[in-house]
Amino acid sequence: MIKLVFALRRRPEMTLDEFQTYWRETHAPLVAERAEVLQIRRYVQVHTTDLPGLHAAFQKRNGGAPEPFDGVAELWFDSLDVMGGDDPAVRQAQAELLADEANFIDLPNSPMWMSEEFEVVGLTQT
């Protein structure tokens, strides 16, 4: 399995609550509806918890730190091969999701990358 990680920053005019509500209640169903055609095996939203003083503590610990992301999307696929291709249905689903992402994500400041997990501690460890 391969995982797409998308570190999200909200559009500047949105509050954290507005961003997270839109992501959870509007965008998530769009992803779920397109999961089969896109061959998404798993989709997880990681929502930032805004705890007073926590970011300042992290900045102090790390000797400075950029502003945290507003959330992280994690999408699992069987392989890179299923993510591309010339299938019009796949291209259409990708375009629809990208169009919706522009409604709530600051896309130029939200990096994404492909990753492979190496579990160190967890339930599946033997």
Regions found by a protein language model. Name each.
Residues 1-126:
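Macromolecular interaction modules
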